[in-house]
Curated annotation (Swiss-Prot):
EC assignment: 1.17.4.1
Gene Ontology annotations of biological process type: DNA biosynthetic process
Polar residues biased stretches: 969-979
Native species: Rhodopirellula baltica (strain DSM 10527 / NCIMB 13988 / SH1)
Signal peptide (residue range): none
Protein name listed in UniProt: Vitamin B12-dependent ribonucleotide reductase
MF annotations from Gene Ontology: cobalamin binding; cobalt ion binding; nucleotide binding; ribonucleoside-diphosphate reductase activity, thioredoxin disulfide as acceptor
Family matches, as InterPro entries: RdRp_reductase_class-2, RNR_2_N, RNR_lg_C, RNR_NrdJ/NrdZ, TSCPD_dom
NCBIfam families in UniProt: NrdJ_Z, PRK06556.1
Lineage: Bacteria, Pseudomonadati, Planctomycetota, Planctomycetia, Pirellulales
Enzymatic reactions: a 2'-deoxyribonucleoside 5'-diphosphate + [thioredoxin]-disulfide + H2O = a ribonucleoside 5'-diphosphate + [thioredoxin]-dithiol
Record text on cofactor binding: 5'-deoxyadenosylcobalamine (coenzyme B12).
Amino acid sequence: MSTVLPESNATSRIPANDPALEKVDSEHGVEYAREKFGTALRGDRAGLKFESKFCPDDGRTPFATTAWDLRSAAIKDESGNALFEQTDCEVPASWSQLATNVVVSKYFYGDPKNTDERERSVRQLIHRVTRTISDWGLADGYFDTPEDGERFYRDLTWLSLHQHGAFNSPVWFNVGLHAQYDVEGDMCNWHWDRTENTTAQPDNPYEYPQGSACFIQSVDDNMEDIMRLACSEAMLFKFGSGTGTDLSTIRSQREKLSGGGTPSGPLSFMRVYDSIAGVVKSGGKTRRAAKMQSLKVWHPDILEFIECKWAEEKKAHALIREGYDSNFNGEAYASVCFQNANLSVRLTDDYMEAVRKNENFQTRWITDKPTTEPPSYVAKELLNKMAECAWHCGDPGVQYDTTINKWHTCPNSGAINASNPCSEYMFLDDTACNLASINLMKFVQQDGSFDHERFRAACRTFFIAQEILVDHASYPTEPIARNSHKFRPLGLGYSNLGSVIMTAGLPYDSDAARGMCGSLTALLHGEANRTSAELASVVGTFDGYVENEAPMLRVMQMHRDACDQINDDGPAELKEAARELWDGVLEIGEKYGFRNAQATVLAPTGTISFMMDCDTTGIEPDIALVKYKQLAGGGMLKIVNQTVKLGLKTLGYDADTIDEILKYVDANDTIEGAPGLQDEHLAVFDCAFKPANGVRSIGWRAHITMMAAAQPFLSGAISKTVNMPTDVTPQDIADAYFWGWELGLKAIAIYRDGSKQSQPLNTKSDEQKATDAAEAAKVETVEKIVYKPRRERLPDTRQSLTHKFSIAGHEGYLCVGLYPDGRPGEMFITMAKEGSTIGGIMDSFGTALSIAMQYGVPLEVIVNKFSHTRFEPMGHTSNKDIRIAKSVVDYIARWLGITFMSGNDYSPSAEGAAKTGGNGPDLTTAPAGATANNNSPVMAELRADAGAAVALVERATLLASLQNGVSNGSATNGHSNGQSAGGSSDGAVAERAVDGLGGQADQFSRFQTDAPSCDNCGSITVRNGNCYLCHNCGNSMGCS
């Protein structure tokens, strides 16, 4: 969550025209450290010893350990227009252009229009943050000697500079602005005043910068506190932060007020909170605020809570059908409630046992006023209702309340009731958490092994830095400032797990990968807690430790016991290292206690993953094997992920075979069918989304089992939405919710692709599926048909198909003329507003398409080229197979694909997917548009009148597949991998080189049919955790 302190009355003194940026830290050193050195917290106790593990101790500054470039940084929209630009930015030569663009545009301080008052080098940015944190640590007495403090600064700087780790965005936004540049601003937040031993509001908020993005707030069952929460949420949204609250404390609408009246219930106040979030845009931006609202399953209003979002979605759909703007930020959605929050139901073990036994579940009153029994529900039916609503709109998710509190380190101070918006931070009410993430790929060695010793050293360094920030940061409310000091929760995590797994030659969906994930997470959590105990020996435990000592030690023992359950198929040395580490954690923890009540979470690491040039975020697998790399001089280059090459090398392939496989992936966007690749290794390269020319992807169950491998080794939870394909059923979602509880997860959120605009489809019977499979397996004898590049005109009298469409209220008609065998050969496009500009353009577009089809341009080329083209008018349609069209051209192309091509990658229809076995469109075709979807209703109708002609075109299509494509090994489905027999791909290569930005947009639009455009640059986003991430500008629509 982007967190920015107010800019009013802010002044700065950034060093202008510095002639020697390479000496940005030359004024510091051991002598300077001696001046800053203090023992404020530790008194007579010895401080931390710190040995350099990363930055060479050879007299050079950390910034002299890398080469530097001068580059321009720019953020452009999909049309190439610059939204942000800064020239002559100094960045490490090893950083990608995307990392440069993200860091310069988001994290450099100052006015972009005044470069003399703006940071212009990455070394300024990193030095501002790491020097400030180190100085604070020196002054507070964390380090044993000034030399230890200076070594800490050097290592922390080196790790940040070389992309080994990164703090969450608020740290880069705010830390060091006062200490390094004397920036000042108005009083607003709260901090802990160590001198007075209480909370206070600083005169200058930049002196105590806000460093956290994750907040949890409480609410009591009275009007004053309910409105107080509304006010504090508004202030959090103003500063760009996200917040979560459990509303189970608010009495049900079925209960009584103290004066005898009828209460409103939590849902009524949710409408108030939702309205505030919709009006106060997050961080002053146009995106919606990030918030989480939960309700415990035993609350009497639980059914209304479960159904509330879907009930409002149906209103939006009705408005859209009447012509209102269908954009997610448009009039239709703006006029309905509950669109600004994630919703979660808190499930208890007794409820889940009732589901297992198919028993009734009794809710309970919040107060003792009622004399009647509260509502009772069949537990399984209630779970099915959650799944049904999540199937429709993605909410509610679930949080497993009993499991969460079973792993709670501070139960004597209160229960864990809520989470932050992304569900990874779960702790006491009115607390905050600052996050940091380690880039796992930086610790993979040349031989493919993982350097767990250096990984632990990096974890220790960042954890110390996070701890130093706690009392030097400010917080949006007084209770949060007080509790942050009292409990000091931190959230260290990691990123790039998916890349590490692929590099190791392991499928993401494998016991070996889950074993590796468990071991790495155990090492992360173990080192964080070991460091916390080490800090306790120096500066003391957190204030709430004494009353929670026994439960905290019990939880630590649970973590150690879980080490023995790590899957043995993973790397044995990592599992053994985790066991030994946790033995040490228990020993030092029992002796000194712990400095921090919580230590780790797994956040989605959106924007900071780009800063570290990570291929994958958080615990996620890779989204695709092919990426689009931004070039320093502008434009984009299509590249195959380096992890593919590393994975192939680990699997033992020789250099020539690897080169052939990489060429194939580059040409085809998929590794399926690559020459020389063994079938048993295909799963290693499976990604989160199916490639355009492939059929494989990681199943949703694998995402849940990977979460289960990591969960026992985290203080908090995992921010990860389990993405499901369009054709899953509500029962699949209910099964996932129950399975997550059985596996010991703390939370799970489901998002079904297309759920924002799709309706339920009846699944086929087993008999019908068997019939379809048998039909697909039929292979006819074919004859050789030779097509020449000539114009094939339609007969004077021909059949045609007329289709009426409506896009966001703009009506039009498509009339497609057909050859005798059912192929489309011409198209007339008529818009309702005759004579309009768009009408003329569409008429010309129809003529161009007609000529193209008659001269033999394959239909799938036309469909692939024009699908997902984005411009106005766009929005909801009346076609159940194409719920949202990104333009009229997009609608026409996808309608052609659905109607005349086999497969239906162009709509979210589960029925169509079942008809083709889920394998997508057949990408091989005869010339002159010979491909036709002979299973479609249109072709079925035509087949009655032209059976012989249709049989001919079926044979021609199959022949073209055999002649022009290389079989993918499945003789029963007729799909080729799209590789030309002659190996000619020059045209495709040229297209990739000149249309990189369009290619990336097309690639991402295929991942999820209803992914929104970025609110910053307009590019299509990809779902990341509970929010969306833009791979063009690095914007995270909800999380840091």
